[in-house]
Amino acid sequence: MSFSPLIRQLIDSLRILPGVGQKTAQRMALQLLERDRSGGQRLAQALNAAMEGVGHCKRCRSLSEDEVCQLCLDERRDDSLLCVVEGPMDVHAVEQTGFRGRYFVLKGHLSPLDGLGPEAIGIPELLERIEAGAFSEVILATNPTVEGEATAHYIAQILAGKGLIASRIAHGMPLGGELELVDGGTLAHALAGRRPISL
């Protein structure tokens, strides 16, 4: 089916979303145009408002409508703990655990093949944040990928000479998981990170 230039532009715009391919973008575009024009208008208004009104917190670099986000303004948080994550969605995931420390959001992970070095992901800003704070421990909560591990290792090496504890989030067996369904790499990490049972 051949689409008009405006429909083609809408389809191409929808394809920038993660996990949205050509067919899904076509279905979304046609749904909005044929069956839910008011929903499409609301989507356009909400997207425009978010693009105009949401920026990055100047302290933690998470997404915020204000210069400093609500998490950074919360005086009840533990100023001795800094959790370093790869992106804003990771902040929300860690918050669900009840973590009460502070955050710093990198812009991804180190990936030399993609041209992402320390400056590109914000490591100089991280070091400034650490030096400006009163942190005793930096929790490296980057993803358990090759790049995430390399990023955590790189940061830990820098922090080694600063008298700070650099810790890494544990990873391994998911709660409720079955051994036979877990891949070998995950199981190897779980075995290497085993700990005694406290009674």
Swiss-Prot record:
Zinc finger (C4-type): 57-72
Gene name of the record: recR
Single GO term (MF): zinc ion binding
Residues covered by the Toprim domain: 80-174
Domain of life: Bacteria
InterPro entries documented for this protein: DNA_Rcmb_RecR, Rcmb_RecR, Rcmb_RecR_Znf, TOPRIM_dom, TOPRIM_RecR
Protein name: Recombination protein RecR
Species for this entry: Ectopseudomonas mendocina (strain ymp)
UniProt record similarity statement: Belongs to the RecR family.
